[in-house]
């Protein structure tokens, strides 16, 4: 009737409630197992192009993606966990798999900001971290977003005002270390990511062999600091610490018996 407020349909309410429940279950289970951070949510749009993104995306519409991501992040927060929106400014419109190749998105900056990147400023007040894409946006910068000062410092920090932590994507991926025709070593890739504006660099699945490759990177970073090629950043360290949970996690047995956990399970599809 006149003056009455429109309310979402039951399907929409189920979707948002399920997203919050999924965030809570994910974060509470991880924390009960000793894991204090998860690189979620995926904010990429489902253009039907990317096999590596695919059903990891919430939807094609950036408004739907933002709504469901916000609900999921609320669930993460209820369990004491931060979040990481990825892959900035959007990985869903390219076919190539950035784990092995270097995808190229030829759209204009205006088109990207109006569509794929739209969730980032919309969620700016609740995003605690962002992970850039290993994608080249050729009409914006010749370097992949994760190595691009234009994307990370000028656009994400400057234009969008993001103040949280910026993680590199996994630099152990072959496609992640290709920059302007050069294949970078692990240490070179880490330094390039930090120089571009990342606060933290990820080098995953390199703990084999006693972690010798990781030790080498740390040793070479120390050498680079002595040579003046890189210096630890106090602000980056503050951003990292801000991602850590402030309250103790439940143990597994008490979690799975808790009423809020069981209610969350009931809300999942």
Residue ranges and their predicted role:
Residues 26-38:
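Acidic-leg catalytic submotif of subtilisin-like serine proteases
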């Amino acid at each position: 009737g006149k003056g009455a407020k429109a309310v979402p349909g039951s399907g929409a309410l189920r979707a948002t409630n399920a997203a919050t429940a999924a965030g809570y279950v994910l974060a509470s289970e991880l924390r009960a197992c000793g894991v204090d951070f998860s690189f979620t949510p995926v904010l990429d749009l489902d253009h039907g192009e990317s096999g590596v993104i695919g059903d990891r995306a919430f939807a094609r519409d950036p408004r739907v993606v933002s709504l469901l991501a916000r609900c999921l992040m609320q669930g993460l927060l209820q369990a004491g966990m931060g979040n990481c929106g990825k892959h900035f400014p959007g990985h869903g419109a390219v076919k190539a798999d950035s784990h092995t190749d270097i995808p190229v998105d030829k759209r204009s900056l205006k088109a990207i900001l109006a569509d794929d990147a739209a969730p980032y400023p919309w969620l700016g007040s609740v995003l605690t971290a962002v992970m850039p894409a290993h994608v080249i946006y050729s009409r914006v910068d010749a370097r992949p977003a994760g190595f691009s000062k234009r994307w990370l410092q000028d656009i994400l920090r400057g234009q969008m005002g993001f103040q949280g932590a910026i993680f590199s994507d996994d630099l152990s991926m072959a496609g992640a270390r290709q920059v302007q025709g050069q294949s970078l070593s692990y240490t070179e890739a880490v330094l390039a990511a930090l120089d571009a504006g990342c606060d933290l660099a990820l080098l995953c699945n390199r703990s084999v062999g006693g972690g010798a490759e990781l030790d080498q990177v740390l040793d070479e970073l120390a050498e680079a600091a002595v040579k003046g090629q890189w210096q630890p950043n106090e602000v980056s360290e503050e951003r990292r610490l801000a991602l850590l949970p402030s309250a103790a996690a439940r143990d597994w047995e008490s979690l799975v018996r808790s009423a809020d956990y069981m209610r969350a399970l009931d809300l999942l599809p």
